[in-house]
């Protein structure tokens, strides 16, 4: 026997074929959401209030500070919020201090700042009763970036961009004549020396002394027309504010506000970190030859001589001096911009490979503090210096697709940015109110207007591209949605602009972003998934764990280091499957490893780190595909995506062949009920589980509080599927923290169970599995193997109209008693009633418009109390194809104190449940991207059967395997059969699972033929088929694309207003489009009359439609068709262009184009007004 038994949860053991032991537990998979939101509540909010405090009025007399805040108790708990369509939120109260400087008076007050949405334990928000997820956004990190491009003549030109978190961009570039230019905030370009002069380096000589003499600088100076700092400032002002009269003072304040004002320009802590990393001397002198000595400025001691090559060893020796004060220069420039002098470090080095021994000056920004969130003049000088160094061949360009240069904005930061917008709008209002209010009587409450804050938060949760309606089709869909990374959204990319490079897999994605799981279509590569072990650091960079290798002893230690993408670039990383002895030493002299983008073989002494696990490369969904290593990546992508579309079945079953990931994914998805503390189960029932908490004190275990866990029963999920939880523990069980107490939808015994294990044969059958179609046995229908439960919600509201209130009632005009038989006395359907399309769910009448009554009529009305005015029937009816059983009815009344939208008096919600068996036309798939549509469901007796008489369940086309290269499905098939025969579940983790030898030996252990094939007999004749067939057990899922949702037919229905043609699509109850090519087909057959009626009566001949309907009702001959409406639209279009268009008959007489008139119906015996007419609806 190969493999060892491993316990997953309380109930499931699997035989695992893994060879590599788990060094590191998988982290909590939704930590990316919860951790970020916790940060926001603990630190993010405080940071915001600090940024905006104090708000001072224009005279500087009043000052408003935000001191502290606290969150109250939510108004409704989670379940109540969902029921009432409310937002799960807590009131935010802020302590505000108002200081009046004239009198020294201080007023403190607590101000309510609106309700703040809270995150649930499972990482979601409940907004207006619906669960939503905030997707993390991948954006370019603020920093300075250098790039190069080659023009058509082969000339290399460089560019640089300083990108802040918010504020003006600064760009450097060279042109064809080798002049270096600068652009400030995307305006017209200026010679770079203009910016240096504006900073205070007024003469040419000062600039040359600063940056070193070179041809590029000389070219820029030649192009520069300014002579002094003042002239340079005016030049910049004219570019940024064309048309305004420039003055030196205005120019100074403009330049200051663009770059040096913390309120307008923000690098954020991440930008400062990246900037220092890029521009500091210690990162730039590596492998350079010094052209001047490096001197400790304080002591005057020379720490490195001229001509020294600074390799890693030499650099390490002088790094302390570099970090403190090596070659420090201080420029005290009287430029009126900033008071502090500019501190820089500058070192001359030789240009590499230059025969004339030319030098270039490297200027480093002398260690600005991490607290400085603005750009400093030293940063600008060192970035300009880096640019000139690049032109001389010193330094590196950046790869913007590298994950070291892209960071994540998670929930917390996105919320903070949104909150900041609200606060800055509020700040404006506060300032205005300060100047209007009376200083004596003013209070903080009067100054603060919380509307803009509430509005910006509401807008973010309600309509931001990153706030999405949670995909709740099954637990995996839920989990994946919370771990999604999107490059789209505000401040990100757009689909149209994103090129191939951004979408491509990059080597830095390894262990951070899944290379497999991404949507097909226009979003490919822009929406990704976080890898299974990855986490996000304080700066928003994605880190992945590695095992540290001890350099001296060359052994792999148990120390785990989390590295970001740019840190990893410095190290050599061995793969997780490198062979180790018991002490952690590498067994092979040469080890397969990665260094930057290369996969190579290196000596074992060169290893710095080792992978933690083979599955750290892929995401949670991809890690659920067994034998992933044997599948082509395109098909694996489909497999990972289709698992998310699996419909929860009525009787779920975990896969025989799993990967060991099923338990973790189910536990962290939020669909299961998980124990929050260690305890003993006291009581179990369908709707709740009670657990007595156990706490350790002084080495003894003491029982304390009782925790009650509520279970969801037959609720409706966001995707309209049935959300039901079932207990899997018994009273008396001792449960640990994080153990699963109850299965959610698509779970079995604490493991994810998206589909069912079925017996599959790879064979054709009369051509019914042509083009990936699936043939299925009727047993799967009879035994409810693929039956799922769907719940749809319908609502009807009674509003106030201009003519009076609508009324929910049983008394509906022109409706038979039979149609009302299932309504109660209020006019609402009974729970448990079986309904078909067109049945009334909620009876409702709306007052009809009546002519204004005369005084006499009003008097008679008042005296005799005549029957009330006319009403029309606006009842809620069951839409097409939604038959089922009424599961639940919820009624909300304004009178009972329920919160309803304005103008609504009563709201009724009806839930209808359907039990859907599997059908011809439903879509099925395996986990390897092998998808198909059911083409035929055969009686059990016609299915091929095995020698022992067992009929198989499903036949798949063998031609679906070779060209698609997803061989994983075949290995799963064989191993699944062996597992079924042995009565066990197996785990084959990705990239470390069963190899073919394991599969064959397990097959032999199960007593099967070693090739996994068997003789099959034709169920119709009893004869054996010519060849032996691969038969085994495969895990197959039923997908959300069900034929019931797609099949659609129309008799008459709504028409488009302008063209009068039927609408399209099932949702609009539309028709089938008979397009240009279909017209050609009928023309080719000469079917003139058929074509004429399709283009007239059945489409947009408005008069003919009505006349035809009338003729059919009366049983008369169909009249001749008239002119289609679209022809009239064409005529009107031409007339609107000033062309006089008339239509003549064959006698050259004009044909009148007329509208449909009421007198067309005068002679008809049938009351057209009462007949169900084709209605025109406003839909354009």
From Swiss-Prot:
Superkingdom of origin: Bacteria
Q: Which PROSITE patterns match?
A: RNA_POL_BETA
Entry's Gene Ontology cellular component terms: DNA-directed RNA polymerase complex
Q: What does this protein do?
A: DNA-dependent RNA polymerase catalyzes the transcription of DNA into RNA using the four ribonucleoside triphosphates as substrates.
Q: A single GO molecular function, which one?
A: ribonucleoside binding
The gene it comes from is rpoB
Query: Keywords for this entry?
Result: DNA-directed RNA polymerase, Nucleotidyltransferase, Transcription, Transferase
Enzyme type, top EC level: transferase
Q: Hey, which family's this protein in?
A: Belongs to the RNA polymerase beta chain family.
Please state what the protein is called. Answer: DNA-directed RNA polymerase subunit beta
Gene Ontology terms describing biological process: DNA-templated transcription
Name the source organism. Answer: Macrococcus caseolyticus (strain JCSC5402) (Macrococcoides caseolyticum)
InterPro entries given for it? Answer: DNA-dir_RNA_pol_bsu_external_1 (IPR019462), DNA-dir_RNA_pol_su2 (IPR015712), DNA-dir_RNAP_su2_dom (IPR007120), DNA-dir_RNAP_su2_hyb_sf (IPR037033), RNA_pol_bsu_bac (IPR010243), RNA_pol_bsu_CS (IPR007121), RNA_pol_bsu_protrusion (IPR007644), RNA_pol_Rpb2_2 (IPR007642)
């Amino acid at each position: 026997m190969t493999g060892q038994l491993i316990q997953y949860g309380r109930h499931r053991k699997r035989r695992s074929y893994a060879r590599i032991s788990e060094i590191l537990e998988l982290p909590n998979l939704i930590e990316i959401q919860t951790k970020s939101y916790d940060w926001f509540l603990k630190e993010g909010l405080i940071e915001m209030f600090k940024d905006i405090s104090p708000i001072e009025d224009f005279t500087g007399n009043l000052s408003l500070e935000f001191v502290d805040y606290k969150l109250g108790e939510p108004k409704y708990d989670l379940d109540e919020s969902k029921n009432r369509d409310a937002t799960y939120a807590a009131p935010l109260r802020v302590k505000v201090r108002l200081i009046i400087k004239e009198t020294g008076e201080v007023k403190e007050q607590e101000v309510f700042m609106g309700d703040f949405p809270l995150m649930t334990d499972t990482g979601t928000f409940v907004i207006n009763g619906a669960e939503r997820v905030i997707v993390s956004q991948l954006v370019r990190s603020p920093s300075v970036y250098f790039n190069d491009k080659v023009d058509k003549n082969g000339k290399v030109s460089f560019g640089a961009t300083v990108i802040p978190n918010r504020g003006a961009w600064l760009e450097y570039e060279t042109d064809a004549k080798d002049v270096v230019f600068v652009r400030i905030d995307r305006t017209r370009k200026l010679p770079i020396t203009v910016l240096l002069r504006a900073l205070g380096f007024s003469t040419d000589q000062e600039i040359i002394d600063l940056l070193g003499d070179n041809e590029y600088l000389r070219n820029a100076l030649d192009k520069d027309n300014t002579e002094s700092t003042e002239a340079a400032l005016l030049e910049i002002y004219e570019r940024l504010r064309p048309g305004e009269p420039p003055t030196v003072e205005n120019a100074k304040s403009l330049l200051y506000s663009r770059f040096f004002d913390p309120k307008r320009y923000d690098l954020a802590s991440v930008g400062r970190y990246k900037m220092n990393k890029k521009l500091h001397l210690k990162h730039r002198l590596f492998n350079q030859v010094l052209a001047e000595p490096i001197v400790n400025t304080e002591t005057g001691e020379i720490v490195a001589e001229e001509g020294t090559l600074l390799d890693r060893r030499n650099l390490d020796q002088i790094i302390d001096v570099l970090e403190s004060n090596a070659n420090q220069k201080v420029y005290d420039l009287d430029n009126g911009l900033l008071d502090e002098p500019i501190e820089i470090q500058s070192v001359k080095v030789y240009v590499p490979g230059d025969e004339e021994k030319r030098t270039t000056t490297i200027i480093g920004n002398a260690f600005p503090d991490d607290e400085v969130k603005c750009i400093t003049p030293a940063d600008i000088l060192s970035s300009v210096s880096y640019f000139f160094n690049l032109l001389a061949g010193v330094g590196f360009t950046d790869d913007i697709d590298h994950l070291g240069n892209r960071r994540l904005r998670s929930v917390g930061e996105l919320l903070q940015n949104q909150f900041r917008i609200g606060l800055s709008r509020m700040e404006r209002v506060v300032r205005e109110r300060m100047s209007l209010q009376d200083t004596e009587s003013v209070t903080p409450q009067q100054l603060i207007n919380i509307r803009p804050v509430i509005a910006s938060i509401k807008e973010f949760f309600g309509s931001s591209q990153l706030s999405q309606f949670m995909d709740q089709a099954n637990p995996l869909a839920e989990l994946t949605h919370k771990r999604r990374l999107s490059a789209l959204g505000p401040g990100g990319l757009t689909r149209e602009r994103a090129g191939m490079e951004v979408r491509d897999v990059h080597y830095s994605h390894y262990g951070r972003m899944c290379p497999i799981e991404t949507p097909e279509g226009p979003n490919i590569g822009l929406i990704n998934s976080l890898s299974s072990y990855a986490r996000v650091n304080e700066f928003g960079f994605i880190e992945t764990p590695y095992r540290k290798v001890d350099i001296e002893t060359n052994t792999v230690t148990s120390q785990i280091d989390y590295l970001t993408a740019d840190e990893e670039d410095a190290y050599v990383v061995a793969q997780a499957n490198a062979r180790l002895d018991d002490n952690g030493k590498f067994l092979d002299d040469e080890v397969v490893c990665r260094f930057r983008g290369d996969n190579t073989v290196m000596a074992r002494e060169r290893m710095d780190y080792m992978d933690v696990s083979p599955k750290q490369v892929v995401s949670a969904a991809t890690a659920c595909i067994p034998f992933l290593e044997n599948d082509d990546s395109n098909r694996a992508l489909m497999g990972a995506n289709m698992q998310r579309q699996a419909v929860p079945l009525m009787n779920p079953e975990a896969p025989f062949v799993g990967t060991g990931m099923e338990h973790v994914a189910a536990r962290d998805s939020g669909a299961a009920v998980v124990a929050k503390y260690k305890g003993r189960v006291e009581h179990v029932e369908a709707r709740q589980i009670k657990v007595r908490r156990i706490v350790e004190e002084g080495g003894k275990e003491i029982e304390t509080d009782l925790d009650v866990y509520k279970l969801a029963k037959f609720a409706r999920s966001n995707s309209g599927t049935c959300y039901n939880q079932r207990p899997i523990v018994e009273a008396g069980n001792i449960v640990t923290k994080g153990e699963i107490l109850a299965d959610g939808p698509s779970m079995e015994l604490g493991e994810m169970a998206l589909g069912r294990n079925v017996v599959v044969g790879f064979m054709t059958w009369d051509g019914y599995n042509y083009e990936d179609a699936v043939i299925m046995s009727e047993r799967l229908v009879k035994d409810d193997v693929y039956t799922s439960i769907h719940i749809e919600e319908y609502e009807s509201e009674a509003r106030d109209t201009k003519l009076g209130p609508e009324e929910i009632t049983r008394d509906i005009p022109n409706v038979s008693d039979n149609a009302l038989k299932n309504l109660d006395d209020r006019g609402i359907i009974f729970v448990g009633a079986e309904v078909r399309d067109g049945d009334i769910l909620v009876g409702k009448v709306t007052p009809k418009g009546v002519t204004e009554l005369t005084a006499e009529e009003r008097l008679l009305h008042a005296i005799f109390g005549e029957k009330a005015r006319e009403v029309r029937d606006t009842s809620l009816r069951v839409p097409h194809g939604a038959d089922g059983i009424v599961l639940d009815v919820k009624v909300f009344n304004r009178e009972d104190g329920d919160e309803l939208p304005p103008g609504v008096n009563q709201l009724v919600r009806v839930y209808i449940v359907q039990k859907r068996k599997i059908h011809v036309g439903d879509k099925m798939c395996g986990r390897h991207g092998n998808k198909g549509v059911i083409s035929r469901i055969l009686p059990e007796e016609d299915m091929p059967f095995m020698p022992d008489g067992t009929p198989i369940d499903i036949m798949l086309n063998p031609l679906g395997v070779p060209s698609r290269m997803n061989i994983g499905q075949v290995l799963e098939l064989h191993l699944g059969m062996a597992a079924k025969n042995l009565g066990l579940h197996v785990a084959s983790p990705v990239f470390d699972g069963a190899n073919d030898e394991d599969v064959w030996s397990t097959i032999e252990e199960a007593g099967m033929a070693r090739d996994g094939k068997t003789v099959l007999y034709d169920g119709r004749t009893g004869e054996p088929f010519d060849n032996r067939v691969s038969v085994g057990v495969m895990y197959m899922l039923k997908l959300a694309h069900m034929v019931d949702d797609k099949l659609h037919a129309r008799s008459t229905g709504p028409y488009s207003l302008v063209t009068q043609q039927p609408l399209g699509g099932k949702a609009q109850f539309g028709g089938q489009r008979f397009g240009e090519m279909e017209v050609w087909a009928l023309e080719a057959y000469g079917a003139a009359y058929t074509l004429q009626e399709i283009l007239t009566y059945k489409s947009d001949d408005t008069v003919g439609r009505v006349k035809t309907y009338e003729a059919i009702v009366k049983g008369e001959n169909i009249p001749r068709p008239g002119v289609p409406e679209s022809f009239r639209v064409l005529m009107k279009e031409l007339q609107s262009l000033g062309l006089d268009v008339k239509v003549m008959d064959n006698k050259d007489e004009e044909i009148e184009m007329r509208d449909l008139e009421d007198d067309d119906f005068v002679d008809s015996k049938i009351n057209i007004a009462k007949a169900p007419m084709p209605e025109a609806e406003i839909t354009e």
